[in-house]
Amino acid sequence: FIDRYITFNEVNAEQNVKNTVTSVFLGKMALLVEGYDECALIDAKQYPARGVEEPSSGKVLRGAHDGFIETLVANAALLRRRIRAPQLTLEGHKVSDCSRADVVLCYLENKVDRKLLDEVRQKLAKIDVRSVSMSQESIAEAMMGKKQWWTPFPKVRYTERPDAATACVMEGDIVVLVDNSPAAMILPTHFFDFVQEANDFYFPPLIGTYLRILRIVVFLLTMFITPVWFLLVKDPARTQAGLEFLAIDSDYSVPLLVQLLLAEFIVDLLKLASLNTPDVFSNSFSMLGALVLGDFAVQAHWLVPEVLAYMAFVAIANFAQPSYELGYAFKLLRLMLLLFVGALDWVGLALGCIGIIALLAATKPIVGKGYLYPLCPLDKKALFALLVRKPISRDNT
C-alpha cells in the first residue's frame, strides 16, 4: 500500500503502537487505513524557523557570514555543505524522557578517536533527566555530573559559526548539535582551546600568531591587573621606586577594596541591565550608565578615577576572548584574589595563585585528556600548534 499509493520520500511502516505515538509527538503524521495492520508514518513536519544569518558573537572581518540557527536539519546541512566527504558521519540520538530532544554527533570516521567517541556515546546514554529545555547547557551539565560544580572553568566550547565547527571536525573533534539551539558544542574541550578563534585563520599566519599571543596576555591581565595594583597602592612606599604613576592622587573616604568590589558589581549590573533594555532605550541607558559609573561616582567620592580606569580595561578585556563562561570564571578568581590580597597582602596573592593553579589541575573535562592539555600532559607539537598559527598545509585545516 505504501509503495503504491503514498508518493512521499520520508515515509515508513510501523506496527508498534508505542513507537507510533512517539513518532506523532515528534511531529510525524500517522496514516491509518482500514484493512491494513501497519501504520504509515509520514515525516511532513515543518517548524517555524528564522533564516540563516551571521551570529551576534564571534564575528569575522573576512570569511563566511552565515551561522547556525535553531533548526537541526539546517545546521547539519551547513556542515555537510563544507565537508563533502563520505567519512563525515551525523549520528542521531534522543535525550530526556519528556522533551525527547534530537542530538546529533558530527565527526569524521577516519579521524575521530574511537575511545573518545564511545565515551561520548556512553555519557549521552546515561543522561537521566526529564527535560533538556536549556539545550546544550542542560546536556553538558548532565554529562559532567555533580562532581565538578565547584570549578568555574568552562568544560565545553560553544560556537555558532559553521566554519569553526567544520575546522574542529576536520581536526578529529566531535561536534554536538542539539535541536532548538543555534550553538554547536565541541568535545573535547581543554583550557588552551580558548586561545584560538575563527579570526586567527582569516589573517596571515604572523597576524594570527600575534592575535593568539595578545589573547594570552589579556587572559593574564584580566585576572591579575586589579589585585596586583591594589597590592602596590595599599602601601604608599611601594609606589615610590619608579612606580609613581600607579599611585592614587586624589583623596578618598571609601576603602579601596570596597571601591574595587563596588566597581565590579556595577559593571555586572550594567551588563545585566543592557540585556533587558529595549533597543529604543539603549542610547539613553548608555548615557545614564556612563554618568552613574563615571562622573557621578567620582563626584560623590564613591570611586577614584584610577579604579574606573582599571575596571574599564578589565571590562573591555573580557570581550577580547571568545567565551562568556571563561570571562566570568576569570571574574570570580579576580574577586577571590582581591579578597586574599586585602586580608593577607603578599601572602594572599601567593596563596591565591597557588589556589588557581590547583583549581586548574583539579578540573576535569567532560571527555578526553586533562584540562591543561597539551601543557599537562605535555605535548610539545600540540602546544606549539595552539600558540602559533601555522601556515595551511595538507596535514592541517
Predicted regions and their residues:
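Transmembrane alpha-helix detector for multi-pass membrane proteins
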Residues: 218-234, 249-324, 329-330, 335-341
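Cytosolic regulatory modules rich in charged/polar residues
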Residues: 1-256, 366-394
